[in-house]
């Protein structure tokens, strides 16, 4: 849904990857019954720039790659950058490696991760992306052209 020219909001992310299955400890109560939360209400923004899309996430509970792949599929544009949470704090080594490989495969220009990535994983992602990595925190200004 376009909220402003060049800015769309997305939700109901497809579960495309086999390694991002969500946290089994989050539940929602529907009609008095608890069930696994699939985070269908989670949103992410897509900003159109000259070369493609910059994705802005909250916490990425559905999985950062599920979010990216869904937005890429819907927009039919290159994902140039990511700003926000990745929810990789609980990711095991296999999932983290697969996520890094997937991000490298789409050839992002920058990744500005923040909360819920985890301190150890921040270092691993920083080492994987070098100058493309930005540690994003409150008050940062990121110039997107």
Please give the residue ranges for each predicted region:
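Short secondary-structure boundary/hinge segments and terminal tails
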Residues: 20, 90, 121, 143-144
